[in-house]
């Protein structure tokens, strides 16, 4: 069978890794996991600042869903953060605007373009990844915002 999907693997019984993970999820005790999550979040709720959890968002579904669940299902006060991509698509920009308009606070960070060009050039020449600077920015900006807003808890999407 041709493999057209990156990272697709099959075990000795011919079951793909996505199906293997799906089977494992059926054996997880979700009730005990939910109780553990609620205990964990109750500690974070003791933080009486404006925000008690940070959620990176990009304009896609994962981070927005995480922020929504934390806010509406678990009563958290999320602050969303995004690192503006070098070539932002209109759909992502529109999604972020809709996200903010639906009641979320968002910190949007534009990295220094001179520094970004240098990191991107190094990323391209050394590892063949022209947006390496943005990848680095995504991870460092999230932590920097957490420190600046004194938020101890970060929930990522995917």
Where are these regions (language model features)?
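ATP-dependent adenylation/nucleotidyltransferase module used to activate substrates
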Residues: 1-158
